[in-house]
């Protein structure tokens, strides 16, 4: 059995017009059912016509068609029925021009191939979609310049809000976000600063917990292997390093860091390098589960027993980690909860609601399985 260690109604407006029936005014004409009146410019029915037919205000009709939860079900049904009768189709461009702001939220992440971020983005989308808000996904590829370009692009037609990854960005991008007035939530990391809203956990504390676990197992030569080298990877490495230093057991040559993208294949390669350099290593913390899974595969090929000869710990508890042989000990990160919480926090900011906790620490779990 795995052992888990936790660280910390709309107002209805109805207009009535009294007009003498057409048959009384034109008794000799054949009367037919009128077709919906179109707009002069486009020939399409308007939102105002939908609202009149449904007997609601224009704003209620707009909200009902967007699926906002602030509109009662009975009004939603009336508005949608009126829209069907009139063959009304929403014009997103006209809506955006009328509001001078699109009903979207921009989400900036450094990768769309890393399952960590796809899990978070999916949770953000699932939380915002019922409120009629779509997301615009920007992929910076871990590059500050690309993220700055994305910030400029999205703010040129301001979204309702932004969710960004961490705090490591160019000063220009930071100034653009601050000056835009667009509500912004940071995720993945924590900061305790005025007017900064963030959802995440302490990466350093997570690295610290891994080091303490390996030391408690009796591992005396503990290595850290990391790839990609984004700020969060470096923070968890720093927490691991400091814990070893406090114990007087830090060895600089037991660190292998590479900017190459994290992968299972890279985990195999870096494990071989480490064993060739220091065959006496008996504990390894790999900064992501794909690296750790690769290390497990390579250890088996090299006839190195895990955990008897070397203990292996990963990070993020990605798919497959519970099915490896041996099953991988790792740090479980609250990715879905993080995306949902960040989206809920942003909704509060968009609605100008009071936010009791601008910094939300979701913590992490050390999941102890068979590999360490």
Residue spans of the language-model regions?
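Short histidine/acidic/glycine/proline-rich micro-motifs that form metal-
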Residues: 66, 111-114, 141-142, 168, ...
């Amino acid at each position: 059995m795995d052992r888990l260690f936790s660280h910390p109604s709309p107002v209805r407006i109805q207009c009535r017009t009294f007009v003498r029936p057409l048959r009384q005014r034109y008794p000799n004409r054949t009367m037919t059912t009128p077709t919906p009146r179109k707009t002069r410019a486009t020939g399409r029915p308007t939102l105002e016509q939908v609202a009149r037919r449904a007997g609601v205000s224009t704003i209620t009709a707009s909200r009902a068609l967007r699926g906002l939860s602030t509109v009662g079900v009975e009004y939603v049904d009336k508005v949608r029925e009126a829209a069907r009768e009139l063959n009304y189709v929403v014009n997103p461009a006209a809506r955006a021009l009328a509001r001078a702001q699109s009903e979207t939220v921009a989400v900036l992440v450094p990768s769309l191939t890393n399952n960590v971020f796809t899990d978070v983005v999916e949770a953000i989308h699932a939380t915002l979609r019922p409120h009629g808000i779509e997301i615009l996904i920007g992929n910076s590829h871990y590059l500050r310049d690309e993220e700055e370009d994305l910030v400029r692009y999205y703010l040129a037609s301001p979204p309702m809000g932004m969710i960004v990854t961490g705090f490591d960005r160019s000063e220009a991008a930071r100034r653009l976000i601050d000056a835009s007035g667009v509500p912004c939530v940071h995720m993945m990391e924590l900061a305790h600063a005025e007017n900064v809203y963030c959802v995440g956990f302490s990466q350093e504390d997570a690295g610290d917990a891994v080091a303490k676990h390996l030391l408690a197992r009796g591992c005396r030569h503990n290595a850290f292997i990391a790839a990609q080298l984004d700020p969060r990877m470096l923070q968890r490495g720093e927490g691991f390093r400091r814990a070893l230093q406090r114990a007087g057991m830090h060895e600089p040559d037991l660190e292998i860091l590479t900017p190459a993208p994290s992968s299972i294949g890279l985990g195999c390669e870096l494990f071989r390098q480490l064993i060739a350099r220091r065959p006496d290593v008996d504990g390894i913390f790999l900064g992501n589960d794909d690296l750790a899974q690769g290390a497990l595969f390579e250890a088996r090929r090299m006839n190195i027993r895990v955990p008897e000869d070397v203990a292996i710990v990963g990070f993020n508890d990605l798919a497959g980690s519970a099915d490896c042989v041996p099953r991988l000990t790792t740090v479980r990160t609250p990715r879905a909860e993080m995306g949902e919480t960040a989206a809920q926090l942003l909704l509060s900011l968009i609605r100008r609601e009071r936010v009791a906790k601008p910094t939300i620490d979701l913590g992490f779990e050390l999941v102890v399985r068979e590999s360490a």
